[in-house]
Each structure stands twice: as C-alpha cells, then as structure tokens.
Curated annotation (Swiss-Prot):
Biased composition (Polar residues): 16-33
Lineage: Eukaryota, Fungi, Dikarya, Basidiomycota, Agaricomycotina
The species this protein was found in: Cryptococcus neoformans var. grubii serotype A (strain H99 / ATCC 208821 / CBS 10515 / FGSC 9487) (Filobasidiella neoformans var. grubii)
Gene3D superfamilies: MFS general substrate transporter like domains
Function of the molecule: May function as a transporter or as a sensor for myo-inositol.
Primary localization class, coarse: membrane
Glycosylation sites: 365
Protein name per UniProt: Myo-inositol transporter 1
Localisation per UniProt entry: Cell membrane
Similarity comment: family membership: Belongs to the major facilitator superfamily. Sugar transporter (TC 2.A.1.1) family.
Amino acid sequence: MSARPAQPNIYAPIRTSLSGYPSPTHSGSSTPASLEFSDGRLPENNVERDMSKVVERVALLGEADEGAVIVEGEDKVTKFVWMLVSAAAISGLLFGYDTAAISGMLVIIKDDLGTILSSWQKEVITSATTLGALLGGLAAGCVSDFTGRRLVIVFANVAFIGGSICQAACHTVAAMIAGRFIVGLGVGLASCIVPLYIGELAPTMIRGRLVTINCVAVTLGQVVAYAIGASFQNVHNGWRWIVGLGAMPSFVQLAAIGFLPESPRILLLRSDVAGARAITAKIYPLATIEQVDRKIEIMKAAVDQSIEYNANSTWFERLKSLVMVGTNRRALIIGCGLQAAQQLCGFNTLMYYSATIFAMLGFNNATAVGLIVATVNVLFTLVALKIVDPVGRRRTMLFTLPIMILALVFAAIFFYYLTLSTNGILIEDHDYPRSLSILVLLSMLLYVAGYATGLGNIPWQQGELFRLEVRGIGTSICTAVNWSCNMLIAGTFLSLMDAATPSGAFGIYAGFCVIGWVFCWMLYPETSGLSLEEVYFVFEEGFGIKKSQQLRKQKLVEAAKLKAIFE
C-alpha cells in the first residue's frame, strides 16, 4: 500500500475547516495578528469577511467546537461509532414502539379494563403518554449536564420497563393511564437526550446522518409495534402482550450501557481531559495525535467558557439568556418552531389512531394496514438518512412540506366524498366504498413519505442550534414544545373528527403544514455541514439564511479539495 501523503498544516494554531481562510497567528499574545489568507491577501468578498469573523471569534473567545478542525477520516463512520450510535438508538426503538403500540391495543382491548372505552377515555389514555413525555423531556436536558448523558438513558430504560409492566398487569382505566404516563416519562427522556448524545459524539460532516439513525430506530419501533399488534389481534388478552413486550429492548440497552462512552464534553466538564481524548481518538481513528489534541483543545476552550459562564450565572439566568440574548433566542425560535410543526401537522394521529381509522373504513385487519403506513415511514426515513447532510436541512424541508400539504388536501377531499352518506362522520360497521377507502390510504402513504423524509427527523437536529452552556435547557424546551403539541393533537383528534368531520380535521392539518413551510422559508437557515460554532455565528445578525448557505457552499468546496489530497 502506498504511503499516505503528508497532510497540509492547516490546523495551527486554531483554524476553521476552510483551509483557504485566514488563521490568526499567536506570538505570545492572546490577540490575533491581522487576518489574512495564506497568500498574504486580505478578505475581499462577503463570504471571506464573514469567515474571517468566525476565525477571529475562535481565536479571541475560544467559541469553536471540535468540528472547526477537519481531520482525515472525518466523513467515515467507524465500527466504534456504529456501535455507540446503534446502542443509543435502542431508546429510539422504544420511543417508536411505545407510541405506536397504543394503536393496535385500542382496537382489541374491548371491556378488559372493566368498561368499553369511550372516545374520551381513549384520548386520555393516549395523552397520558404524551404528558409523561412532556415532563420527561423537560427534565432530561436540565439534569443531563449534571448527571451525564448516559445516566439519563438509564433512567429512561427504568421508566420503559416499569411502565410496560404496569400496563400489562393493569385491570382498570386508571392503572392503564398510570402505566402509559410512566412509559411517557421514558419516551420524553429518550427523545430529548439520545439525539443530543449522538450529536455530541458524531463527526461534523456526518452528524445529521447519525442523528437521523435514531429517527430510523423510532420508525422501526413503530413497525415492530404494528407487526406485533397484528399478530395478537385474535389472541385473548393479546393487548397485554403488545404492551408487555415493550420492556424487552430496555434490558438489552441496560446491558449495553456500560460499553457506551460518556460525551467528551461532559468529561471535559468533569475535568477528565484524558478520558475525553481517548474517546475522541476512537471516534477519529485515522486522525493524528496532533489533530486529536487540537479537537480536544478547541472543545476544552468552549467547555471552559461554559464553565465560567455557568459559575457566574444561575440556572434561571441561563434560561433568561435563551430569550434575552439574540443568538440564543433565534436558535430557540427555530428549534421550537420546527418541533411544533412536526406535531401540528397531525402525523401522530396516524401512529395513535390509524388502526381505529382503518377499522372504520372497512379494512378487515386494520392493524396490518397500519403496518403498511409504518413501513413506508421507515423506508422514507432511510431516504432522509441518505440526503439530510448532502442535500441539506433547509432544502429538504422546503421540498417535502408541499408534498405533505398536497397529500392532506387529497385526504380531505376523499374523506368528504367518502362520508357523504353518513353526514360527514365516520361510523363503525358502515359499508363505505372500497375505492374511496383505498384512495384515503394512498393519500396517507404519500403524506407519510413526505413527513418521514423531512419533518419527521430534521427537528431532532435541534442540539446543533444551541451553544453548550444553554444546550441542555434549549433542547429541553424544544422537546417540551414537541410533546405539548403532541398532547394537543392526541387529546383532540377523535373529538375533532366528530366536530369538524374527518375532511375538516385533515384540512386543518394541511393549514398547519402551510404555516410550517412559510416558517422554514423565512427563518430556517442551512445548518448542514457547519460546525456548532459556525451555526452560532450564523444567528448573530438575524436568522442568517443567506449567510449559512454561503458558508456551507464554501465549506463543501474546501472539503472536496482536502479530500482530493488523499485520493
């Protein structure tokens, strides 16, 4: 094998990932020398001036993250990274399973809880999980800086196991609500902390794809829930097996948790520099010692700044800074807006009530039909895994939301004609035209395809929006917004179908999608391929849509040049 060519020295003392951009030189002073390019010229255009500001901030404030240094093998996923992402994503599997299991359970539970469940009781049972997830999500980000990310994952698994056992053994509606609430705590903890954990361990160039793996696990969990639900449709007390089996993956993850590393940033917060360096070296096995040290040095600068900030501020002051500091506020608006859009589009009505809807439409095994919907969700989440980094977050959202809008409009139209004979209301055991029922199903599949490719996973990239000292609080608030909107949707869907008709309900969801598209078009910058410090810089003066696109374009060009050196 030929010798590896020497890597150009583009990393000292601190550089951005753009080898052509200026690097400050230190000569015993903390103040950088004049910023200039390697050929001696000064920045000329807007992009170059913007990037010179990035470098100057890195030099003066130490605000860069480790993504500001590109190393050899940056765009490769090693076995170690695959192992830790796969193990962490088991929480995503549980998240998906426990939110989808309710769909198959509701159609076969009958009077096993002492009464035939009314629409209101079904909504309360479903919403109990969402309320638990709301509280769990709020708690996760707030405590994870103190406990570490791994311990929060342990707490989530304990909740998954306890809630599953409680549901499987319950004999009253109140006990079922309690079990769903406990499971919801686990869902909230997992939904907040796992994307954050993966994002902090992932190399910058593939961060989006690795976080999306957790979304793939969520959709896979939904498929498993529908498959198990379909298998137990005709089994006495089969619903107890459906909810009880949800505990099994938790035992697997608890066994694997000892092999998962803590986030290097958490280790640096604990002054464990050696531990952080060892984990970083495993993540970047092709990197030189100098490159690993440089990443640790830059990470430590950001962590030290956060420690100093935290030492001189209370938790409430950091919470206040999310609203009062412009860069933090804009990041919070983006994160909360995307999470609200993810739920208000109505997708989880399919996850919670698809079996109920398809049973009313006349499909014999409604849970099996729901399995088709969940499978499409998995397939197009895999598409998202492929495109989320190279195509970009913003472009993906702007392309897929119109697909969702179109599909929801189709569904509203088909529901209108489908229910003409029943005064616009879906009625059980009514013989609806099979052709229109199939058209409703097809429109929902198109809707799910659009959702899974964009809105289903991109909001969970929220960790990249916030600086370290407010990242835990920021992601908690965004996750809480997600589950608050989820609770609104889950707790009103059946009632909305009765009050506004199915056609009206899906028309309302289409309207929310239109608002979401306008939000993304006006406010959402492109964060794909940018280091965490660069994302922060983008928000310094407005929402930085054009600035982010310019930075990303230039970084892609420079990354291609660097890659060509080693080919």
